[in-house]
């Protein structure tokens, strides 16, 4: 193989090949490289200052991108120099990250594959252990995150995701303006959210937060009131309506066990129809519900009350929204619906947080979209024990999706 072709394989600015060896049996190409400048300057690994006062040197063997079917290894001279600021430090090589055994472009290629395929498939392609692939991917994502501009933090979203065994819940804190998560932590206690403020949100940045979208989980509210006393707590619309849907379902179960014979058979199998909004039903489903409501007034009232509650978030002025909700709550007194009376007491306790939406129009849908992205990432990766790695993966996926042109 001509030396000119071997030198062309490298393409590392400032470095050249001075020796090489090809092993046909293993399809391995080893290149010995060093700086090409007549009087090379070495940069301190700590402060980056250039210098020529060498302390010692050694050879480092690192893996580079393959050349066709050939595996390429680089043997590079690594120097230790005496820095006037940092003392004796290892030189900084621009295409190597610290003490890495892989070039930066090799790590970037592995990380790019990890965006489209699970770790097991990427590991098989590159002939690497799965844990090594995760480590390389995480290192690239960390460098990407460190180079991003810091987005303003004015609207926070706080929610939890149910995981199941082990760590049952994962608390997710999101920036609702950029639509991406900014912190994740195990469990859903007040201490969990306290740790977010201690680790990731210093006091000087807290004063810019105007509103927080959160569910009606009291430990979260306690932590937010303590750390962000000036911010408005806006209770998530979808969580409120989920409680209303649960009240409809509880009413359906009560009616099923209260009725007998044909009346019970009519209620059977109608759960998903009752949980769907009237606007999302086709003509046949609407006719089925009309027949059910004609024979069961309690289910008709429960369904109507749930749909009426959704109109609350269409009001712009707090006074009108408060009047609407007060009228809705008064209507519950004359209905024999225990589940909705329980819902009314819940809404009364959280009235101010629900009505704060009139002052801060937080995007409720982004909270659910972020949770959906995290669940999709968890399914594809079959779970993540490293929460920092999960956060970086979702941030990268969200940023990539935001840059793609609309179809």
Tell where the protein language model's regions lie, with residue ranges.
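Short, surface-exposed amphipathic charged segments that create phosphate/polyanion-binding patches used
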Residues: 245-256
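Active-site beta-loop-alpha junctions of metal-dependent nucleic acid enzymes
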Residues: 99-101, 135, 182-205, 211
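Short, conserved DNA-binding cores of transcription-related domains
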Residues: 1-88
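The DNA-recognition helices of helix-turn-helix-type DNA-binding domains
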Residues: 129, 140-144, 216, 251, ...
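Acidic/histidine-rich catalytic cores and adjacent linkers
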Residues: 37, 41, 46, 52-53, ...
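A structural signal for short, well-ordered beta-strand segments and their strand-loop junctions
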Residues: 122, 157, 213, 233-235
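Mobile-element integrase/transposase regions
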Residues: 148-181, 186-199
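Short, positively charged, Gly/Tyr-enriched micro-motifs
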Residues: 48-167, 207, 222, 354-355
């Amino acid at each position: 193989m001509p030396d000119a072709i071997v030198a062309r394989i490298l393409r590392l600015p400032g470095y050249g090949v001075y020796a090489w060896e090809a092993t046909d049996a293993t399809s391995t190409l080893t290149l010995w490289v060093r700086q090409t400048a007549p009087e090379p300057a070495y940069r301190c690994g700590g402060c980056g200052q250039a210098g020529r006062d060498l302390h010692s040197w050694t050879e480092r063997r690192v893996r580079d991108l393959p050349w066709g079917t050939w595996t390429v290894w680089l043997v590079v001279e690594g120097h230790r120099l005496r820095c006037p600021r940092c003392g004796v430090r290892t030189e900084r090589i621009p295409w190597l990250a610290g003490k890495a055994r892989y070039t930066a472009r090799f790590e970037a290629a592995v990380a790019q594959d990890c965006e489209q395929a699970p770790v097991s498939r990427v590991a098989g392609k590159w002939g690497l252990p799965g844990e090594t692939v995760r480590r390389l991917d995480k290192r690239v994502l960390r460098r990407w995150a460190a180079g991003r501009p810091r987005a303003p933090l004015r609207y926070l979203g706080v929610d939890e995701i149910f995981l199941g065994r082990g760590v049952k819940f994962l608390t997710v804190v999101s920036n609702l303006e950029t639509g991406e998560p900014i912190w994740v932590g195990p469990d859903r206690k007040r201490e969990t959210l306290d740790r977010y403020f201690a680790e990731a949100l210093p006091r000087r940045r807290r004063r810019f937060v105007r509103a927080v979208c959160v569910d009606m989980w009291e430990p979260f509210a306690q932590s937010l009131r303590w750390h962000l006393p000036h911010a408005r707590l806006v209770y998530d619309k979808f969580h409120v309506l989920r409680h209303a849907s649960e009240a409809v379902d509880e009413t359906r179960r009560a009616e099923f066990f209260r009725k007998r014979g044909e009346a019970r058979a009519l209620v059977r199998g109608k759960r998903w129809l009752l949980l769907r909004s009237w606007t999302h039903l086709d003509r046949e489903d609407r006719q089925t519900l009309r027949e059910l409501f004609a024979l069961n007034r309690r289910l008709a009232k429960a369904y109507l009350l749930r749909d009426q509650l959704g109109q609350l978030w269409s009001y712009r002025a707090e006074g009108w929204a408060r009047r609407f909700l007060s009228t809705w709550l008064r209507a519950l007194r004359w209905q024999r619906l225990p589940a909705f009376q329980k819902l009314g007491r819940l809404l009364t306790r959280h009235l101010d947080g629900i009505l704060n939406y009139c002052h801060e129009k937080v995007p409720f849908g982004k909270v659910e979209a972020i949770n959906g992205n995290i669940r999709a990432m968890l399914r594809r990766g079959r779970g993540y024990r490293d929460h920092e790695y999960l956060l970086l993966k979702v941030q990268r996926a969200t940023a990539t999706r935001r840059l793609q042109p609309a179809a």
